[in-house]
């Protein structure tokens, strides 16, 4: 992933690339960009290694199942430190979580538990859920009435998210 991002990101910025790594050897570009607009590369990253790669070489990261605590304590500090060490601008942190605007929080969490149970069985998601201090995907989901959901989304931005998708 590291080498791939080191090649792909500059190509999608319209730059020429000459790269020789352990796995890839590439001389290419510059590529023709639609309307000359660079394409940002965002790496799906939850763990320390890929957050480092994203910070060093990409425009940012896209997460899934990382709640505000996980973003503040784990995702944002790691990716920002990597970007800073590489002399790069602050990265985008795109946070994705299930969202349900519903008056019955227990019912909404019950549905979320069924719909997103698979994530609770996968090691990478188990780690990010634990980092966020929750037992499973249903507990990470943003649920409640409009005011509650709005506050929970705002907490993601306060934790370091630059974008939120739901």
Positions of predicted regions on the chain:
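Active-site-adjacent structural elements that line small-molecule/cofactor binding pockets in enzymes
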Residues: 1-166
